[in-house]
């Protein structure tokens, strides 16, 4: 039975998509140990917008967040998302390198890198910056809809990505634009050109098709899927770990995630959401 593994997006893309990045460090800390023990490949924690949000609105130190969270998760790499060179504005390269070094020194283990144009030179300096800081690298192949973005285009981009010192690739569908039919041709194309480089799959539920696209990706060879934990899943966020894992099992695959360990996380963030809406119930023990 083929194993399907998962990377978690709850602490980054989940609340970025549904709570406008308003999850504070204090909201995260009670559940980190459970997240760490559930069997995820990695968990997303920060992106450039989260640094700005933490400083400008939440009045928090983002590097302190990284340190406090990663201290509680020794078994699972924390992952940051890097889509551009600037962090707080139009930053010089020296600031970019300092940002990468401080992120790694405070506990960030991996960097998932995008370039809006899937351009080799755009990828290259970001990959070099992550490697210099000592982080593992996951390179995004960003999906969109246009006459240019054909299977042949993604085959060529995948081959270019393999020329860089990366650990993994990720088919990234940030707009939730993939359909099951398009997934059926895209995934085999990328896998055929990725060789022995592992490939993850990341989509959103914006159109409601995200969970179905995940299942199509799994059936066509993807072994690592990005999911979120409810209530920070679905909608404009990523598919629910419960949904994807259950349906993967129904198709004959094995999930390595301990879903029972995740139930208290769901209860915790549901209570956090209710408190934010004014209902203010007591937070359940995690």
Regions found by a protein language model. Give the residues of each.
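Catalytic cores and adjacent flexible loops of soluble metabolic enzymes
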Residues: 1-112, 116-286
């Amino acid at each position: 039975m083929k194993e399907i593994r998962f990377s978690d997006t709850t602490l980054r893309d989940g609340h970025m998509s549904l709570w406008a990045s308003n999850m504070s460090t204090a909201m995260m800390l009670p559940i980190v140990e459970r997240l760490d023990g559930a069997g995820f490949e990695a968990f997303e924690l920060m992106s450039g917008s989260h640094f700005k949000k933490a400083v400008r609105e939440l009045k928090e130190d983002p590097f302190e967040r990284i340190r406090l969270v990663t201290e509680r998760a020794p078994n699972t790499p924390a992952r940051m998302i890097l889509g551009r060179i600037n962090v707080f504005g139009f930053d010089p390269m020296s600031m970019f390198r300092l940002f990468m070094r401080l992120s790694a020194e405070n506990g960030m283990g991996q960097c998932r890198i995008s370039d809006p144009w899937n351009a080799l030179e755009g990828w290259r300096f970001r990959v070099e910056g992550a490697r210099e800081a000592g982080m593992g690298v996951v390179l995004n192949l960003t999906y969109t809809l246009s006459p240019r973005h054909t299977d042949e285009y993604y085959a060529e981009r995948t081959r270019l990505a393999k020329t860089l010192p990366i650990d993994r690739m990720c088919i990234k569908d940030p707009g939730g634009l993939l359909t099951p039919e398009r997934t059926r041709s895209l995934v085999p194309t990328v896998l055929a050109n990725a060789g022995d480089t592992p490939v993850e799959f990341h989509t959103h539920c914006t159109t409601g098709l995200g969970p179905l696209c995940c299942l199509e990706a799994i059936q066509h060879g993807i072994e690592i899927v990005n999911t979120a934990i409810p209530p920070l899943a679905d909608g404009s966020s990523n598919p629910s770990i419960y949904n994807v894992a259950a349906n993967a099992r129904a198709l004959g695959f094995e999930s390595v995630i301990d879903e029972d360990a995740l139930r208290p996380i769901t209860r915790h963030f549901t209570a956090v959401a209710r408190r934010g809406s004014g209902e203010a119930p007591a937070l359940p023990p995690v």
